[in-house]
């Protein structure tokens, strides 16, 4: 029997909505990355995009354990010499909480063309509202919450 390889036309994509309120950032990112890759489906193939769309709301209420809020630093580079910028997570979560979740999920996806395609299916919003109601997203509940 030959190994099954999913074809692009056979893949059925769902929309999932995750509430990030009081959920630890790393746990949230692992669940989101699993849904984006499609590892929860029996038709998963590591070289094909079989994943679903993920909408994360309440990104501003995400939890960080320990002293990460004060000590963890997010880096970015402008592309010019001496253009390395750094921002603490305390400031990042107040200014752009969506970016903190995007960085965490992006680090858990493949670092190639497929990963760049998968990250486009992640939609993160700081508040409780999102414009994807027409897609009828299914609520995805994460059991573990911050202590």
From Swiss-Prot:
Q: Does the keyword ATP-binding apply?
A: no
- GO annotation, cellular component aspect: cytosolic large ribosomal subunit
Show the CDD domains listed in the entry: Ribosomal_L13
Enumerate the InterPro entries for this protein: Ribosomal_uL13, Ribosomal_uL13_bac-type, Ribosomal_uL13_CS, Ribosomal_uL13_sf
Keywords linked to the UniProt accession: Ribonucleoprotein, Ribosomal protein
- Pfam families from the UniProt entry: Ribosomal_L13
The processes (GO biological process) annotated in the record are:
negative regulation of translation; translation
Return one GO MF term.
Answer: mRNA binding
| Source taxon at top rank | Bacteria
* Functional note: This protein is one of the early assembly proteins of the 50S ribosomal subunit, although it is not seen to bind rRNA by itself. It is important during the early stages of 50S assembly.
Subunit structure, as described in the record: Part of the 50S ribosomal subunit.
Please state which protein family the record places this protein in.
Answer: Belongs to the universal ribosomal protein uL13 family.
Q: What is this protein called?
A: Large ribosomal subunit protein uL13
State the species of origin. Salinispora tropica (strain ATCC BAA-916 / DSM 44818 / JCM 13857 / NBRC 105044 / CNB-440)
